[in-house]
Amino acid sequence: MDLKGKNVLVVGLGRSGLASARFLKKHGAFVIGFDEKAEEQFKEEKNDAQKLLDEIYYCEIPDEFIDRVQLVIVSPGVPLSKRPLVLAHKKGIEVIGEIELAYRFCKSKNIVAITGTNGKTTTTTLVGEILKKQYEDVVVCGNIGLPFIDTIETSSEDTIFVLEISSFQLETIKYFKPKIGCILNITPDHLNRHLTMENYTKAKMRIFENIDEMGYTVLNYDNNITRDLIGLAKGNVIVFSKTKTQFENVVFVENDVIYFTFEGKTQEVMKKDEIFIPGQHNLENALAAISCTLPFGIEKDTIEQVLKTFRGVEHRIEFVAEINGIKFYNDSKGTNTDAAEKALNAFENPIILIAGGYDKGESFEKFASLVAKKVKKVFLLGQTKQKIASELERIGYKNFEFVSTLKEAVRKSFECAQNGDIVLLSPACASWDMFENYEQRGRMFKEYVNELLTTGM
């Protein structure tokens, strides 16, 4: 793919878009940037954009402008239904994302690509940690750490890439072919963008559409939707399950012990209770990580060592502090009901929950039922607070309170908590109504908890 002298339009000037622009510029393209946000809404990105881009358009771009470009790179946050992208498709101009662009210039074909509604970051990090014990050149990137495009020019044919990939990024691939494509689970999420579960599932399935007979598809047998994909998967299939399951290549649990069967050989790995990070969802993440590393010939002892010591990742049921016997956990990455339910189920102690945020169109019916069983009190904030409250009231749960800020939620949670209680931030919603992203929300939560430690807030 020769970029020199090409007019390339980058749509969406966030992290992924600017990373693509840097790469395009370095390879001799004339780079035009467009973002629907008004110019004054840009903060630190504005200076980067002005340095990188030959032309910039904010808010809107003239229709006739599309005739000037030979390639469009779209950021994952931009729906393909946006007018410039629809026009480009109609005119036969190629529209791809940053993942596809990076793949076309990537020297290595040792790519592990991991997607799923929940567990992506933890599993991606785990896979990276396991592989790094046996291989020198392992790069973990994508939605975690650096964008894929920022890592390829310092890589070689021997580099192993471990990518966290979202459904939005998978919408814009074309030739992207990982050695291993993994779908951890599929539950309702991003329905404001995908509209239906069928569309969402089809987007996730794209991770294995180009895998050949030398590659592997990893699927979760315990999730209804991914189980139904086993017969449709490309390449060699590796299945993981929390129960004993009969497949040629499988990672499973029997009598509380983890085993794998791969290429005709069955091995015991470890007792499931020896995994350091808590919760059934993290057991699934561990089984998936084992599945993704088997084709690389990883030793069983290496897997065991990592799973016994890996302490999890930031914003995923992250222990923050203990104050007067009250433990605070940051699960800001709980951006949908399924993730928040898994966080609630990870604890046996009484829970005081902080929930609510940006409305992605999910139902809170099932979530409310679990809250009623597991949670002493809920502090609700953000766009969805009334929606969640209505579901709680419908089933007769009245121990909730509206708050205006996260700081207020932390203070009031501490005031009503008792020795042995858990204060859990697991919003079951995205963060965009009050914060830039879930990372900022999680960091602010930790900051407020640490203020309690020092000042009593």
From Swiss-Prot:
Annotated compartments: Cytoplasm
Gene name per UniProt: murD
Name recorded for this polypeptide: UDP-N-acetylmuramoylalanine--D-glutamate ligase
Organism field: Caldicellulosiruptor bescii (strain ATCC BAA-1888 / DSM 6725 / KCTC 15123 / Z-1320)
Domain of life from the UniProt record: Bacteria
EC number assigned by the record: 6.3.2.9
UniProt main location, coarse: cytoplasm
Function: Cell wall formation. Catalyzes the addition of glutamate to the nucleotide precursor UDP-N-acetylmuramoyl-L-alanine (UMA).
Single Gene Ontology BP annotation: cell division
